[in-house]
Curated annotation (Swiss-Prot):
Its cofactor is Fe(2+); L-ascorbate. Fe cation binds at residues 96, 98, 159. One of its GO terms (biological process) is DNA damage response. InterPro entries: Oxoglu/Fe-dep_dioxygenase_dom (IPR005123), PKHD_C (IPR041097), PKHD_hydroxylase (IPR023550), Pro_4_hyd_alph (IPR006620), Pro_4_hyd_alph_FE2OG_OXY (IPR044862), RmlC_Cupin_sf (IPR011051). Binds 1 Fe(2+) ion per subunit. It comes from Bordetella avium (strain 197N). It holds the Pfam family PKHD_C. This is PKHD-type hydroxylase BAV1196. It is an enzyme of class 1 (oxidoreductase). Keywords: Dioxygenase, Iron, Metal-binding, Oxidoreductase, Vitamin C.
Amino acid sequence: MLLHIPEVLAANFAQHSLRALQGADWIDGAQTAGFQSAQVKRNRQLPADSPIGLQIAAEIERALMRMPLFLSGALPTRIFPPLFNRYAEGDGFGIHVDNAIRYPPGESRGVRTDLSATLFLSPPDTYDGGELIIQDSYGEHRVKLPAGDMVLYPAGSLHRVTAVTRGERIAAFFWIQSLVRDDGQRSLLFELDGAIQDAAQELGVGAPSVVTLTGVYHNLLRRWASP
């Protein structure tokens, strides 16, 4: 399931963050890639301990935990702290898949990467290329979103970033460990939750059918969830 989550960051905060990141010190992105990914990765990355990066990352996490759409779609149990990348003209990232386990800096307990997230910070009209292309059984999905918007997708998906041909593309990227690791089960719960919300609006929260469906949702979550 691919999920577009609009306005994770307010427009003014996204603009402020972009200006701050443009003035930060960046390193070669290949330094943080695995052996296979390093062969196809051409970008810059903000060091994980960058003060401005940590500040913006914390705001992203706070914003997400206030968003019902994210909570319903991801069912998050752990979030790998957001990182930041920068693609200048000629930069891109070839086809690859994300590592199954990621270790936050200074932690020995890994995060299982059930979901990948990209939050765009550069307005789409300021650069050409730089599209996130995600492959699944339905084909290729090309993603280029407004500043402050985010896409959520299964971390096991093959994906790439097309070469930037004008301007630059700055974005946050990170991973989520979900209560429900199976993407199909998580998608069913997301659709069921949406149907319950629609029914509650139409019939009322206390309507018998709404209560019954809510019980089905929680019983499925109880069956499928693992902390």
